[in-house]
């Protein structure tokens, strides 16, 4: 995430963030953590960084686990929520694959290196095609315009603040999903045996 969205080519560990603002506080916190890590590396501390992509699977249903929310909605209500036209690319990785990647980094990683722990680069449309195939369930494809998604996100955020729960959707989430986020985990595969 800290490397930013992909601009034509999958993002790798040596990629630099495009000249774009951070979409979420989560992204900002990762960038700040990188600066702290650099300071510790300069002091001789051994540090390896894991960079998971769009993780899904068991866990709290927060903004960071929004893909799992989409899967639950798909399975429960048989609805595919598609922002815009659903052509934007994301890199989806299962939480257990990330856990295995973390173990590999601890065993084989090199200090000062970062490793992208990713899965497949697919559009949201393709993601739902795969979900339909795996689950054996068809769902209605509900395409949501950007202005509508932003309006719903603002209302949801206000309601969540007032009632004290985590919002289902935020404006940051909407803006994030409007970009392409293709990543390459080639380095983790070559150096660590990550699959």
Indicate where each model-derived feature is located.
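Active-site helix of classical SDR
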Residues: 29
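Conserved beta-loop-beta element that borders a ligand/cofactor-binding pocket
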Residues: 35-58
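Mid/C-terminal beta-alpha module of Rossmann-like enzyme folds, strongest
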Residues: 101-168, 185
């Amino acid at each position: 995430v800290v490397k930013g969205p992909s601009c034509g080519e999958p993002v790798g560990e040596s990629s630099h963030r495009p000249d774009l603002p951070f979409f979420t506080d989560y992204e900002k916190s990762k960038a700040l953590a990188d600066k702290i890590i650099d300071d510790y590396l300069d002091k001789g501390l051994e540090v390896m960084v894991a960079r998971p992509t769009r993780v899904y699977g068991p866990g709290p249903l927060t903004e960071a686990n929004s893909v799992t929310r989409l899967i639950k909605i798909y399975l429960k209500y048989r609805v595919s929520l598609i922002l815009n036209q659903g052509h934007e690319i994301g890199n989806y990785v299962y939480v257990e694959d990330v856990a295995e990647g973390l173990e590999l980094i601890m065993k084989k990683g090199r200090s000062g290196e970062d490793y992208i722990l990713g899965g497949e680069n697919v559009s949201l449309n393709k993601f739902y095609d795969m979900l339909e195939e795996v689950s054996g369930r068809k769902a209605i494809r509900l395409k949501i315009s950007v202005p509508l998604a932003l309006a719903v996100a603002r209302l949801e955020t206000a309601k969540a603040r007032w009632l004290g729960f985590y919002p289902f959707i935020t404006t940051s989430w909407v803006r994030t999903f409007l970009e392409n986020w293709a990543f390459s985990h080639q380095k983790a595969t070559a150096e660590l045996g990550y699959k």
